[in-house]
Amino acid sequence: MTEVLLKELSNSDIDWMLATGIREEMTAGAVLIRQGQSVNALHILLDGALTVSISQAENNPLGRAFAALEGGEMSEREITRLSSGEMVGEIPFVDAYLPSTTVRALRKSLILSIPQQQLAAKLEQDVSFAAHLYRASAILLADRLERIVTQLGHSTLVFAQPQLREILFIFAQLHDSDIDWLMNAGHVNRIPAGDILIHAGRPVEALHILLDGKITLSAFEDERNPLARAFSSLEGSDTPEREFARLSRGDMVGETPFVDVRPPSVTVKALEDSLVLSIPRWRLAAKLLHDTNFAARFYKVLTVLLADKQQAIVTRLGYGRLIYSTGQPLDKSFKYENELSSDFLAQVALAGARFDWMLKRIRGS
């Protein structure tokens, strides 16, 4: 994936990262990121190979603690491998998450580590750098998510439903002017129940925001090549698909073509009569190319949503962090996976207000 960074970053971006980052050689087997422990840097693999694994959560937290005290290692399962040009670590905009995977060197490797504090400041001050890095991150995450699903089996798509409600993040991050542009650039479509919005394996022509109703996501259960799938859907053949998620108002589909050149692996269908705002792909692509501020915010949204889907797969397979359940006493010494911060709750209110404002504008037009 070396070409992703070289293609997406500018010379000044690379110069800053080289000047700010710290180079470190890792021996085979050395741990770069440990599951459940905080990370204070973004790591770029310059040379070598890394393996990403998840701990088998067969024991309770107390059992895991004793295993650590006794020097024992819980069994782990590799979910993907990373090559030169990949990035790992907690980028500041996903700092709500503790890492759910362990990353270690597969062989002798060279790492460039950029401290989180300096990176956060750079992202805040340099919008061009932010747009470039967020886009590169989204491209790498989309590719990694596809590899994880392939490694674990396509049945794990059922676990890929995000933990974040997309409306809560999308409308909290975008500015009022961004939402205004989306409304002006898009058109509102009524989708009857049963109609297909996006065909798996075929080109996606628009970004869709669900204003009202419900839609389903389903994936092919067969292993045919994408071209065969695309033409089978054109011919109306009865190809077996499995539903793995349902989305409601405020959710977004059709965003992945902006960071992944592969055709979509899911079919999007209206479960009931639905209302969607559709922004043509060519118009959004032009906006992203010419409006750097908008691009930075848009690619930031995609990066967090992709990271959240990856997190959802790991967590819902039964690996990773603690989850608080109703009726349990809270332990302040633990950070729960589904614990909400005050900042997040404030964003919820802002997102809801912006979405309602958009609906009123659309219905009033």
Predicted regions and their residues:
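Cytosolic regulatory regions built on CNB/CRP/Popeye-like sensor folds
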Residues: 1-365
